Amino acid sequence: MVLDITGVEKQGIILFSESELSKEFLELIWIIVSILTTIVGVTLGVLVIVWLERKISAGIQQRIGPEYAGPLGIIQALADGIKLLLKEDVIPARGDIWLFNVGPAIVVIPVFLSYLVIPFGKHIILADLGIGVFFWIAVSSIAPLGLLMAGYGSNNKYSFLGGLRAAAQSISYEIPLALCVLSISLLSNSLSTVDIVDAQSKYGLLGWNLWRQPIGFLIFFISSLAECERLPFDPPEAEEELVAGYQTEYSGIKFGLFYVGSYLNLLVSSLFVTVLYLGGWDLSIPFLPTSNQLTWILTNGTFDIINAIIGIIITLTKAYLFLFVSIMTRWTLPRVRIDQLLDLGWKFLLPVALGNLLLTASFQILLLD
């Protein structure tokens, strides 16, 4: 007797293919939702930073600051953003239109890409790459090209000089920054941002790389401020010398991209300081149960949500503490000259960062022996 199972096989193949297609479709939807959620969250974070900076600077200068747009003026930054969107987009008549238009996008897009490898919790990360920290350094090195394009495409001497200064400054401080990241990677035996946080959480509060790499932390802090072009490291935008630097000819939404990009970069730097030196989402306070310890108490889906929320809150709290220090630095220290800035990067920070890397490597070799 011969059984005809051709129809059954076809039906099984069709059901299997449909299930695979639905699974791929759901994964695609999940990726899109995750990316959009990150973009919205980061944009809201920038609005909070702008409001905090205005309030803190007002307090330092004994002013009130924004107070009419919403409670305590909290939506003043949103109102300013809408105003920039509605402004006319002026293009220089004799400038290079293509370079002028593409420059702001090349500056902003790498900053958004940096958020892919930032962990806000144990499993809250868009892309857990094995070379996460190097990915951040690689994409951030693209931004100087956009600054040069913006300065050259404006057909303005002040813009061009500002673009040259910005590119030189970014290249100068990218190297000490990368050397500090290498030192952290040697201590953690990994280039993954998640593994770096896990390596710190093994030893609690005393395991933070802030205590194991104090010199590297100071170099990373100074270099990140210079990368973000924050005072006292903002010669590319020195008003007394270059009007507004490479932003001089920009208006409307393109100027808004530069404005948002600078704060996005500042938030990225603060988050990486948190991940690399301050233990990331790990709290590690004595006698206070952390998320890892609570896992033994609660094991249902509700705990996963609570754990994720706690991790996000801890990470953002540490990042905003670093932002507070950056804002205080901006409003209390004078601007340095461009020659002093480059000398600091090449003649002081680079040799010290190299020495710190050699000491870290020697220490790791001794441990292996």
UniProtKB/Swiss-Prot annotation:
GO terms for biological process: aerobic respiration; photosynthesis, light reaction. The keyword Transport does not apply. It holds the Pfam family NADHdh. It catalyses: a plastoquinone + NADH + (n+1) H(+)(in) = a plastoquinol + NAD(+) + n H(+)(out); a plastoquinone + NADPH + (n+1) H(+)(in) = a plastoquinol + NADP(+) + n H(+)(out). It is found in: Plastid, Chloroplast thylakoid membrane. Keywords: Chloroplast, Membrane, NAD, NADP, Plastid, Plastoquinone, Quinone, Thylakoid, Translocase, Transmembrane, Transmembrane helix. NDH is composed of at least 16 different subunits, 5 of which are encoded in the nucleus. PANTHER family: NADH DEHYDROGENASE SUBUNIT 1, NADH-UBIQUINONE OXIDOREDUCTASE CHAIN 1. Belongs to the complex I subunit 1 family. HAMAP family: NDH1_NuoH. This is NAD(P)H-quinone oxidoreductase subunit 1, chloroplastic. The lineage of its organism: Eukaryota, Viridiplantae, Streptophyta, Embryophyta, Tracheophyta. The gene is ndhA.
